[in-house]
Curated annotation (Swiss-Prot):
Its main location: cytoplasm. This is Probable transcriptional regulatory protein Amuc_0709. GO terms for cellular component: cytosol. GO terms for molecular function: DNA binding. It comes from the Bacteria. One of its GO terms (biological process) is regulation of DNA-templated transcription. It holds the Pfam family TACO1_YebC_N. Gene3D superfamilies: 1.10.10.200, 3.30.70.980.
Amino acid sequence: MSGHNKWSKIKYVKAKEDAKKGKVFARFAHEIMLAAKSGGGDPDLNPRLRAAIDGAKAVSTPKENIERAIKKGTGELGGATIQEITYEGYGPSGTAFLIEVATDNTNRSASELRTLFTKNGGSIGTPGSVAYQFERKGEARIMAEGLTEDSAMDLALECGADDVEQGDSDNEWVFVTSPTELNNVCAALREAGHTVISMKLISVAQNASVINDLETAKAALRLYEALDDYDDALNVFSNFDVAEEILEQLG
């Protein structure tokens, strides 16, 4: 099994801790709302909601925040309607970006993202302009102390996942599968005694655009961070990777 996610290098370079910025709570709240909206407020009947709740608990999200997000998603609490939408754009050297946002105003989000792209050397695209360069996959994350790479691979095979790699910390593991098998893989991971802290669909670049120039790498990273910092952003995907020798200069 080979690593599916070129972002492991990018995350290493960025070394960004969203929790310190208070963004993790907000992202889990959005995910819980969207999960409850699409599949109902009972986590026993809604695998996506269950994973979102477990993930929120793993980062110590207050119980009342979780309950409020569920009620907003099911409509029990009033307020603006949140919807999930994907925007597309181009970065330095024609690199491709997808940004999934949770928003109550698509026109506002489009305008704000257009500004972010422009300020950081990119341009927002039209629907379908770069999406064809990505493939949809299912992703499940668990926290498991003491799991080695070999045992993680064995677990992936047992649970029917296509791939596995280490996540953002030593104890986090990311399992990748086809979208249609995501629920089954999550169920198998839980059956094996693991808590799934995140399950979602992701976009994986079919071909990486390798950056071999220091200034271009800096520009691409600035754009990625600007998009990732956007308040309504849920996920940011891109097809760029950074060459090892450039990565060392950035380190």
